[in-house]
């Protein structure tokens, strides 16, 4: 029958990987929570393996994961395509499309991070892979009368135009000025929260990807009487609601400038300060 298993490193399981199962595919882990070796991938390939999926976040390197280079080598030696989720890998510009240039058969990029609408993205890959994707799109569903899975996932023409405009803008703007502005706005939050007792704030040292700089917020609950989750809940319940989160296995809230209009970072910082004073 049809191959239906997509291999994914156990270390790389993440919130969005279940989207791969929308077509009826089955995710199969390889490796362990501690590390992934070449042999782990080699021994996991079967007659049912349809692809190997790789989650790429260059700003968070993982020395214990099997590298993309080795993944591509092993998969291609066995005639298996490699899919890369590179949603936020848009800066520096030389990583834009980098993974298909390395030999991956497909990579996706989220266009929202460049200013396009939330529902849009880019699919890069081999001619064969893009042809297959086009058959599953709502255009393929209607135009070619192929009963794929893309009918519910319409992208309007104006959204497509928006993606083109966003990419052109992203490729030509002054990124040094963009980063300097984000760093300065992150600093405003630090200035507001820096004098609050029991609070530790620091600049996130990163310029790669879609969320440069930003602020890492930690609290001493014994001093503030407020936990990180309390902050999340109270910010969400306020007016206007501010959505933050504490990711699993982390002891801080990361506050990013992406998505905030000029001046809104001061609202965020002031609201948090009010909760902690």
Predicted segments — roles?
Residues 1-168, 190, 194:
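Conserved PLP-enzyme active-site core in the AAT-like
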Residues 190-274:
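Conserved C-terminal alpha-helix-loop-beta "cap" of PLP-dependent enzymes
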Residues 146-215:
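Structural motif of enzymes handling amino- and sulfur-group chemistry
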């Amino acid at each position: 029958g049809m191959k239906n298993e997509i291999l994914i490193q156990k270390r790389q399981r993440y919130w969005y990987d279940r989207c791969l199962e929308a077509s009826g595919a089955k995710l199969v882990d390889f490796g362990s929570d501690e590390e992934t070796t070449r042999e782990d991938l080699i021994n996991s390939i079967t007659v049912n393996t349809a692809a190997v999926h790789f989650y790429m976040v260059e700003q968070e390197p993982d020395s214990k994961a099997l590298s993309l280079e080795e993944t591509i080598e092993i998969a291609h030696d066995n005639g298996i395509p490699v899919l890369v989720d590179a949603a936020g890998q848009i800066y520096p510009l030389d990583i834009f499309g980098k993974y298909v240039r390395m030999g991956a058969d497909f990579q996706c990029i989220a266009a929202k991070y460049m200013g396009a609408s939330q529902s849009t993205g880019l699919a890069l890959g081999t001619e064969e892979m893009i042809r297959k994707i086009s058959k599953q799109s709502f255009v393929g569903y209607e135009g070619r009368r192929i009963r794929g899975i893309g009918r519910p996932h319409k992208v309007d023409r104006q959204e497509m135009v928006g993606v083109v405009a966003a990419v052109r803008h992203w490729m030509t703007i002054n990124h040094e000025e963009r980063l300097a502005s984000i760093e300065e706005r992150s600093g405003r939050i630090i200035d507001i929260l820096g004098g609050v007792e029991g609070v530790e704030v620091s600049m996130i040292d990163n310029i790669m990807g879609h969320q440069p700089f930003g602020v890492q917020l930690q609290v001493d609950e014994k001093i503030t009487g407020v936990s990180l989750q309390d902050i999340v809940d109270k910010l969400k319940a306020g007016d206007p609601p501010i959505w933050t989160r504490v990711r699993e296995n982390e002891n801080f809230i990361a506050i990013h400038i992406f998505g905030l209009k000029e001046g809104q970072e001061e609202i965020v910082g002031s609201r948090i300060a009010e909760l902690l004073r």
